[in-house]
Amino acid sequence: MAWQQLHLQCEKDNVDLAEALLLEAGALSIALDDAGDQPLFEPLPGESPLWDEVILTGLFDATTEAGTSHVIEQFSHEIAAQVQASRTWVSAVDDKDWEREWMSNYKPIECANDLWIVPNWLTPPNPEATNIIMDPGLAFGTGYHATTRLCLDWLTEQDLKDKVVIDYGCGSGILGIAALLLGARHVYAVDIDPQAVLATNQNAARNSVDNRLQAFLPEDFTIFCQQQDIPAVEVMVANILAKPLIGLAPYFATLMASKSRIVLAGLIESQTEQVTEAYQPYFALDPKHAFTAQEDQHWQRLSGTFTG
């Protein structure tokens, strides 16, 4: 398979916006690199510091329309203008196992309340903690991205004991697995990417929770719900993008139990108002419904309680 890479250089304050725009344009993965020679020292737990100047590299499938050179050139100018990129360029690359290529960059991450994400090739720094053992494979959700951490932090604050959870847009399965390790009874994980369904099942097995997690493509989950009398969902985690979140609001409401909880992520600051309007008919949003990670100024988290 042929691949194209779009490279953008911008200031760190615009990295989150650039990531969101690259994902919306069809990027399959995004890598961040130092644009200069600036050292980063050991961060505090939960922090992910960035260099002052960052090079973002979005990987596109060249066999799709979004990955053709002329399309990338076209939207690269639009993205560059929005994030004030100092330079952009496009390069062609050979097929590689990109997650394995970047394996050396992964390290254990400490989240809130003694929750750790540990790559499966490394030893947990704290064996007594709640450790999520992950191999991200080709699916989104390593724990490094701000949207994942925002959801993980929220999960550690919830009463998940014996709860039924949906992880919608599950990626690697990290959020659903975290919910199970934090006490949930059962998780239904859903993603549009077959690779994500595979990665979720594999990661669930690594964490010995595969007997309490079922992963589906959306159409298969719909059929499953029609054929099975599944219990009403008590907690929903949806870490995707603003546009699908807005469209899914009525559907999510049909799955929820009375007074169930929901968290939405994958939003940048300018998108929260539209998403809030879509969910207010069904959910009482928390007073501090827009939470911004200190080190990731653009990414937002919305949460609330089902009122149906």
Swiss-Prot record:
Chain sites annotated for binding S-adenosyl-L-methionine: T148, G169, D191, N239
GO MF annotation terms: protein-lysine N-methyltransferase activity
Coiled coil region boundaries: none
CDD domains reported in the protein's UniProt record: AdoMet_MTases (cd02440)
Major location (coarse): cytoplasm
Gene3D superfamilies: Vaccinia Virus protein VP39
Family note: Belongs to the methyltransferase superfamily. PrmA family.
The protein, known as: Ribosomal protein L11 methyltransferase
Species, as recorded: Psychrobacter arcticus (strain DSM 17307 / VKM B-2377 / 273-4)
Gene: prmA
